[in-house]
């Protein structure tokens, strides 16, 4: 029963997110890059955002 609830919740969230067309992915990418340059205490969290990974993420989001 719990798995069905999780799947149903994921489905609803996915359907809502797929309808959002006004997301400006460039602003999202710039925000992530800005976080990389500032706040050294958050650096560990953003360590996986290397330039290659950011480029791949940006490409994937634009293709979406």
Curated annotation (Swiss-Prot):
Record-listed Leucine amide modification sites: 36
Coiled coil location: none
Q: Which protein family is named in the record?
A: Belongs to the non-disulfide-bridged peptide (NDBP) superfamily. Short antimicrobial peptide (group 4) family.
Cite a GO CC annotation: extracellular region
Tissue distribution is: Expressed by the venom gland.
Compartments where found: Secreted
Q: Where are the transmembrane segments?
A: none
Keyword list, A-Z:
Amidation, Antimicrobial, Antiviral protein, Cleavage on pair of basic residues, Secreted, Signal
Q: Which GO terms describe its biological process?
A: regulation of defense response to virus
Quote the function comment for this protein.
Antimicrobial peptide.
Has keyword Manganese? no
> Which protein are we looking at?
Peptide Ctri9677
Keyword Signal set for record: yes
| Signal peptide extent | 1-22
Origin organism of this chain?
Chaerilus tricostatus
Q: Which domain of life is it from?
A: Eukaryota
Q: What positions belong to the pro-peptide in this record?
A: 40-64
The extra comment attached to this record reads:
Shows a low ability to inhibit hepatitis C virus (HCV) infection in Huh7.5.1 cells.
């Amino acid at each position: 029963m719990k798995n069905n609830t999780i799947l149903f919740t994921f489905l609803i969230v996915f359907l809502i997110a797929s309808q959002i067309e006004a997301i400006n992915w460039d602003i999202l990418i710039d925000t992530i890059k800005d976080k990389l340059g500032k706040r050294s205490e958050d650096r560990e969290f953003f360590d996986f955002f290397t330039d290659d990974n950011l480029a791949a993420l940006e490409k994937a989001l634009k293709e979406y």
